[in-house]
Amino acid sequence: HQYRYNDYYLEMKKLLDKKVLGDVKLVRARQNFFARRYDWQTLLYREGGAMRNNAAHTIEQIMDLAGSDELPEIHSRMEIWNSVGDAEDYMFATMKYSNGTVYEVEVNPSDAYADGCLFDIYGTLGTMKVYSSKIQYKYFDPEECPMFALEHKSLHNPDGSPAYCTNNIKWKEETIALDPDMMNVFGKCSSRFYHDWYEHLVNGAELYMKPEHIKHQIEIFNEVERQNPLPVKFSKPE
């Protein structure tokens, strides 16, 4: 759960809280790479698999973005593509919360390019692309580009030919550079995570990541696994 302390997530959340994209309608999150795993995390009896290993971080971030510990409406798929164990290495789920926003999360072990972003975020005022090393967002000011009044009749040009909707949006684009060193990025977010634990245990600060919150995250895991039962094929060696 240290990923909630990542620079990219903190900056992304700050921008979304400012409503730079207006009302967020769709969030697509992905952890794509090419991998053929053969370690303990490919084994169900050891609680392995793409969801509990990789997607767990993203699902917790999505819960925070939604601002809710509710069990969302979930549609999911889990399969074994490249790994040698019995736990899933591919996972895809859509989660719709009561706020109306749809969240998608994917872990794909067959992406040899792996050049996509971590998050694509779509709102009524624009779009955001979130990478570990930068955030790009394109948006407009609704006061500069007011919505047109509804027209019930067919649109026509002055010469009588058919016309089509034109928005003439004045786009603004911004980029925020982040630390490109992945090992340093992981070290920073982990340090922040354990620093908060220290402050809670030693100085009585409010616990940032509460057990009740994690309990609801596990409920999401359980629902995805209920929809995608995988047979246990391996057990602990004697």
Which residues does each predicted region cover?
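Active-site beta-strand termini and strand-to-loop segments that position acidic
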Residues: 93-100, 121-123
